[in-house]
Amino acid sequence: KANAEATVYEPIEIIKADTIESNHSLSETSESLWIYQATKWKIKLQTPTTNHSQYYRVNIKQTYTYRLTNRKTLQDSTAISTQWECSGYYDTALMDGKPGTPNNSDPIINFIPTINNYYNVFNDAYFTNNQYTMTLDSWYSFLLDNKLYKIKKITGKAIIQYYAISPAEYQYLRAANAYADHDSSNLLETPVIFPNNIKGGIGIFAIENPTETSIPLKSIEDY
């Protein structure tokens, strides 16, 4: 019989979240008109005071609500579109001390793989006095107009989500990051080993402790 134990860790505190840059571009087809939105975030964080290292992961959930009118039937309706995605490519903690730059053309030795942080995990190693300001990028494509529906209004919100995770889950997700970039045909690459904390089984049992903040995004009237 498989069994496992997990510790629930204290959540991180979001002190402040701001958008420092937001860019929009239009994309038009014969059937529809889309807006592509890219946003850069600065998020000030504070960890609880403890005598051990702390581990987290982050994501951004963006939701847009459409108020629509069918051009043929004139019937009104509501549609909701949601996307979970963000990038920490330019952040020190999420890139483990090696953030990217807009023109990152440094030579990289081919047989040393560059690990991407697909699961957006990090620890408190880069925090000072329990505080840190994180840089995140998010993007979203949403429909502005099409032939079938007249879009009367679009409202959006972003929910920035942080999860306090266990050391075991942190190591597991780091291994998953490495595995996603692993080239099994390259004999010079070390095989990825996944940690396990389930007695009599395989995998990771973990309980995450979430905290989040919601920020309204621009509505269609603002464009």
PLM features per residue range, with description:
Residues A2-Y223:
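A sequence/structural signal for flexible, mid-protein segments enriched
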